Amino acid sequence: MVEQSDTMKGTTTVGIVFETGVVLASEKRATMGYLISNKTAKKIYQIAPRIGLTTAGGVGDAQQLARLMTVEANLYEIRRGKRISVQAASTLLSNILHGNRMFPFYVQLLIGGVDETGPVLFSVDAVGGTGKEDGIVATGSGSPMAYGVLEDRYTLGMDERSAIELAIRALRSAIKRDAGSGEGVAVVVITEDSYHELSDEEISVLTPN
């Protein structure tokens, strides 16, 4: 049995469903025990044209899963002639993780995007347990601090800018109190029309006071 504390170290990631899309966000710190091993760690991966994956946990496990999911999403589109849906991608990811439950990937993941059903967001644990998130979700060691902000400020059907600002605010709260989180934030916005990773300049403009 994998304890939750074993899969939630050294990261904070956030997912928010807004009116027309999904915001995925993370901070950039990677740690090895008490050492800050990387200050520009990538924790959000594009696995399909309108689907993103956030990762918390072991870096090697997360990178391997991101590569595998990208390949599987491409194969799905080639074989079926249509893009994989967010739910199908979460089910595939769940099956991969559950199939390795005796030798688990030490990760906690969010998978979100926009498909024919609209904006969709799922959380996935280390042994394949999935849950559809209706509005907000956070993972990693800083998630308790992030949830405090998300629960207080999230409103159903909020607009894109408000969702981005909320994600940044939640991550900043986690960074202030969680030693495993830090070094700035990364933000991805997924809508029906685009998958867009915000630049540092865009983030600085949208960062709430």
Swiss-Prot record:
* Keyword NADP set for record: no
Q: Mind listing the GO biological process terms from this record? A: proteasomal protein catabolic process
Cellular component terms per the entry's GO annotation: cytoplasm; proteasome core complex, beta-subunit complex
> Regulation of activity: what does the record state?
The formation of the proteasomal ATPase PAN-20S proteasome complex, via the docking of the C-termini of PAN into the intersubunit pockets in the alpha-rings, triggers opening of the gate for substrate entry. Interconversion between the open-gate and close-gate conformations leads to a dynamic regulation of the 20S proteasome proteolysis activity.
Q: What is its EC number?
A: 3.4.25.1
Q: Name one Pfam family in it.
A: Proteasome
Which top EC class applies here? hydrolase
Taking the first listed entry, what is the main subcellular location of this protein, grouped into a coarse class?
cytoplasm
Keywords on this record?
A: Autocatalytic cleavage, Cytoplasm, Hydrolase, Protease, Proteasome, Threonine protease, Zymogen
Q: Which domain of life is it from?
A: Archaea
- Which residues participate directly in catalysis? T11 (nucleophile)
Which locations, inside or outside the cell, does it occupy? Cytoplasm
* Molecular-function annotations in GO: threonine-type endopeptidase activity
- Propeptide-annotated positions? 1-10
Give the reaction(s) catalysed: Cleavage of peptide bonds with very broad specificity
Q: Which InterPro entries match?
A: Ntn_hydrolases_N, Pept_T1A_Psome_bsu_arc, Pept_T1A_subB, Proteasome_bsu_CS, Proteasome_sua/b, Proteasome_suB-type
- Asked whether the UniProt record includes Cell cycle among its keywords, one would answer no
Name the job this protein performs.
Component of the proteasome core, a large protease complex with broad specificity involved in protein degradation.
Subunit-level organization: The 20S proteasome core is composed of 14 alpha and 14 beta subunits that assemble into four stacked heptameric rings, resulting in a barrel-shaped structure. The two inner rings, each composed of seven catalytic beta subunits, are sandwiched by two outer rings, each composed of seven alpha subunits. The catalytic chamber with the active sites is on the inside of the barrel. Has a gated structure, the ends of the cylinder being occluded by the N-termini of the alpha-subunits. Is capped at one or both ends by the proteasome regulatory ATPase, PAN.
The UniProt entry, under HAMAP family, shows: Proteasome_B_A
The family line of this record is: Belongs to the peptidase T1B family.
> What protein name does the entry list?
Proteasome subunit beta
